[in-house]
Regions:
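Conserved, mostly hydrophobic/aromatic
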Residues: 59, 69, 148, 193, ...
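Short, small-residue-biased leader/transition segments that mark boundaries at the very start
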Residues: 1-15
């Protein structure tokens, strides 16, 4: 509510010290001042959960499972950080000691400065990871399967001293590793999880993936830029993975086709053995379905053969993201029959 009244600034700028530090009198004063806002958003959340539970029950009844995302980090100005500052690496005044990001690489000489507060894993361990387990339990009430974003940070996370203009001076710090997941299973039982393990995997991440047994991710759009050595090529998959033509953070397949190098496109057509009359998007969908991956996921934009105008998200940008909407009229019987036939031929239909 406070941030909404000053939309051009973050909470760190808007809060006076007394409300930023959750002074009891200040909190009560703002509760009175923002009562209408608070009541409105309580109602919105109530209606969301009411409608979502109905929707999930309906699709589950059709044999459909929902896979949802959980970002590993929360925002600096999130309710989680404000209400639970002890969970994060913060100074006494609430400013971060270090923040999250990624180191410099081939794509960025200065790395990625995300700015999220980092977890105080020592404190979390001392409290038996209670907050994290409650978070995962809440996600499991929304989804049948939870995809944990940036899973590698449980093995080791990149820590950038605050303040910083870029990610050059960060360092890798050991995460909670397998102990976290062993304790999670003891506390919550078996939770269906997909680990987002895209990018360069270090030995500690590979070891954690093997220890947890969680399926990782393969993205076909990443497969065709470095020849036979590329780990995203389908012949290198294990069964315990989820293959995507692309994710919400990628361009659509047809959008990728517009910008990819000619040699990469040629290699993709050759590898996928695409006949001249097979649309490129359907060639990649076919290869995803025919792979040994246990699960194949295809964004609707790729099924419809849409271009870059239908891209869902461009990472690290603001505005214009998550605005694409599916037109129900596009869901034709012909399209359903085509997907069914492809599923049958690739052995992806249950008896």
């Amino acid at each position: 509510g406070i941030r909404d009244r000053s939309p051009s600034r973050g909470l760190g700028d808007v809060y006076k010290r007394h409300i930023k530090m959750r002074d009891e009198a200040a909190v009560k004063r703002y509760e009175r001042k923002l009562k209408d806002d608070v009541d409105f958003w309580k109602f919105v959340q109530f209606k969301f959960y009411e409608q979502w539970e109905s929707f999930r029950a309906y699709v589950n009844g059709l044999g459909i499972k929902i896979l949802g995302d959980m970002p590993i980090y929360v925002a600096m100005d999130s309710a989680d950080t404000w209400a639970n500052p002890e969970l994060f690496q913060l100074y006494d005044d609430g400013d971060p000691i270090a923040v999250a990001g990624c180191p410099p690489d081939y794509f960025s000489a200065t790395g990625q400065l995300w700015g999220n507060p980092l977890y105080d894993w020592d404190y979390l361990e001392a409290t038996d990871y209670e907050w994290w387990f409650e978070r995962i339990k809440a996600a499991s009430k929304l989804y049948d399967i939870t995809r944990i974003d940036h899973f590698r940070a449980f093995a080791s996370y990149y820590s950038i001293p605050y303040p910083a203009e870029n990610a050059i001076n960060g360092e890798w710090v050991e995460g909670p590793r397998i102990k976290f997941f062993n304790m999670m299973e003891e506390a919550l039982g078996k939770i269906d999880i997909v680990a987002e393990d895209l990018g360069t995997l270090t030995p500690d991440v590979t070891e954690l993936m093997e220890q947890t047994g969680y399926p990782g991710m393969k993205v076909l759009e990443f497969a065709f830029d470095s020849g036979e050595e590329n780990d995203y090529l389908p012949h290198k998959y294990t069964e315990n993975c989820v293959v995507y033509t692309g994710t919400h953070d990628n361009d659509t397949v047809m959008g990728w086709l517009e910008t990819a190098k000619p040699e990469d496109i040629s290699y993709a057509r050759s590898y996928c053995q695409m006949p001249d009359d097979e649309p490129f998007n359907w060639g990649l969908i076919r290869v995803a379905y025919e792979s040994k991956a246990d699960t194949a996921i295809v964004p609707m934009q790729d099924i419809l053969g849409l271009g870059k105008e239908a891209r869902m998200n461009i990472p690290s940008t603001l505005g214009g993201n998550w605005v694409w909407r599916l037109d129900g009229a596009a869901l034709t019987d012909e399209l359903a029959d085509k997907l069914k036939t492809m599923s049958e031929k690739s052995g992806r239909l249950e008896d």
